[in-house]
Regions:
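Active-site-proximal cap/lid insertion segments
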Residues: 1-118, 131-139, 188-191, 206-207, ...
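Exposed, low-complexity/repetitive linear segments and helix-based recognition motifs
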Residues: 2, 200-203, 225
Length: 255
């Protein structure tokens, strides 16, 4: 990572964000290899179990009128940026989650969909309403994915996706928000007013923070505006939240 000291404070002190991160701070390469191998092993087990449940369900009459959704609240560090589990960061490994929908009338696909920028937490309600034939509440900010799921063409309608963080076990409260546009990722943390900006086309590993680069000031301003838009549309109280960083986790040198 370039210019570590220019990263937001919660990232500089990410070793103290989770007890497993504290343990991993002393790992060597073999430890990380074992961790990733175990994670992949457990993922394959879960995938087989999901397949078994779906096969059992759709072999019964109830399967003709049942929609199944597989969703997660977060990803896993997978050793990226030397991180494990999940924590305060918004790197791709942490924010990418499974979002699988199966059921009658849903068009099966052989490969994961990569061209649709979705926000599962707010798109889920209108999607389920439309699939169930229930009126979609007009006051909700999400977009129904039902046409796409049925095999119809549906262009990307969200200009961005968003993610949120508040605290880890209420030990250190360091709220943050992420805005992911088709090309760039912007993050903001209340602690120290920290920001990150990554070009996800040229820097998929999120190694170079562009938030302090004058060449990207316009793009930075655009993504700040997108965050303001998200806060307004979702009535997010982000700006009024308080940072409570335990001094124990900010007492050593960053990194």
């Amino acid at each position: 990572v370039e210019d570590w000291e220019k990263l937001p404070l919660p990232i500089q002190y990410i070793c103290c964000s989770h007890r497993r991160m504290m343990q991993a701070a002393h790992w060597n390469e073999d430890n990380y290899r074992h961790y990733v191998a175990a994670f992949q092993h457990y993922t394959r087990i879960v995938a087989r179990q999901i397949e078994s449940v779906l096969e059992a369900l759709y072999s019964t009459p109830a399967g003709k009128n049942t929609i199944v959704i597989v969703l997660a609240d977060h990803g896993d560090g997978m050793g990226s940026h030397r991180m494990v589990t999940k924590q305060v960061s918004f790197y791709e490994e942490m924010t990418n989650v499974p979002f699988i929908i199966a059921g009658p009338g849903i068009h099966p696909r052989q490969k994961p969909v990569e061209d649709l920028l979705t926000q599962p937490t707010i798109d889920l309600l209108p999607t389920l309403c439309e699939l169930a034939g229930i009126p979609v509440p007009s006051s909700k900010p999400g977009i129904s994915l039902a046409p796409f799921l049925k095999g119809e063409k549906q262009k990307r309608q969200h200009p961005y996706a968003a993610s949120e963080w508040h605290s880890e076990y209420e030990v250190t409260v360091s709220p943050g928000r992420m805005i992911r546009s088709p090309r760039y990722k912007y993050t903001h943390y209340l602690e120290g007013n920290g920001e990150e900006l990554y070009d996800m086309l040229k820097d998929k590993g999120e190694r170079r923070n562009l938030a302090h680069d004058p060449k990207y000031s316009k793009i930075l301003a655009e993504h700040r505006a997108l965050l303001d838009d998200y806060i307004r549309r979702t009535q997010d109280d982000y700006r009024s939240l308080k940072v409570e960083a335990d001094k124990r986790w900010r007492s050593h040198a960053p990194g």
